[in-house]
Amino acid sequence: MNIILFGPPGAGKGTQAKKMVDNYGIPQISTGDILRANVREGTELGLAAKEYMDKGELVPDEVLIGIIKNRLKEQDCEKGFILDGYPRTIPQADALAVILDEINKPIDVVLNLEVPDEELIERISGRLMCNCGASYHRTFNPPKKDDVCDICGGKVFQRADDKEEAVKNRLNVYKKQTEPLIDYYTKQGLLVTLDGTKDIDEVFEEIKAVLKKFA
């Protein structure tokens, strides 16, 4: 089954994608990851992408779609895939439709995790990190001692892009990019919207119910 996974920052997309990978044995394909892998491996498309990345510019769609096409042709995608973080625009969605047609792997379903902005802001702006790799949340999982890591005793901190203003900006960008795509895939009868405010396992049970018809 071939899946596109949508959801704003903080909606739990990564968590649900991991559960789908474990449950169905199909790979999660994150554009950021495969882009970095191609650059690291020095592939022709990776080198083309690196030229733009080194200048701090966005990688053009035609380079990105070539990298995605090559990844989807790999053996582990035979039974399906989860596309995470792509497409982000209507032109990208159109380009994706063309390559999926070429390799005969049409999208079965587009899962859209929906969470109200206020909850997303609380989820993300409450995150705390430590340099040792430990992570906390002011409300849901605070360190035992204020601002001190339970594991190494180091000072915990908030990442710059997790601050409330930055989160609001990220959500605005996401909405501008993704709302047209919600409409695009709704018209094709592919979109299923799920309530991302529910418990992680509850959300996954709903995903499994949706995917049952494609498994």
UniProtKB/Swiss-Prot annotation:
Q: What does this protein do?
A: Catalyzes the reversible transfer of the terminal phosphate group between ATP and AMP. Plays an important role in cellular energy homeostasis and in adenine nucleotide metabolism.
Matching Pfam families, A to Z?
ADK, ADK_lid
* Known partners and oligomeric status: Monomer.
Q: What is this protein called?
A: Adenylate kinase
Q: Which gene encodes it?
A: adk
Which species does this protein come from? Methanosarcina barkeri (strain Fusaro / DSM 804)
- Keywords in alphabetical order, please: ATP-binding, Cytoplasm, Kinase, Metal-binding, Nucleotide biosynthesis, Nucleotide-binding, Transferase, Zinc
Record's HAMAP family?
Answer: Adenylate_kinase_Adk
Sequence positions that bind AMP: 31, 36, 57-59, 85-88, 92, 159, 170
The cellular component terms of Gene Ontology attached to this UniProt record, alphabetical and capped at eight, are: cytoplasm
Which residue ranges does the record annotate as region NMP?
Answer: 30-59
Residues annotated as region LID? 126-162
| Chain residues that bind ATP | 10-15, 127, 135-136, 198
Enumerate the subcellular locations listed in this protein's record, separating them with semicolons: Cytoplasm
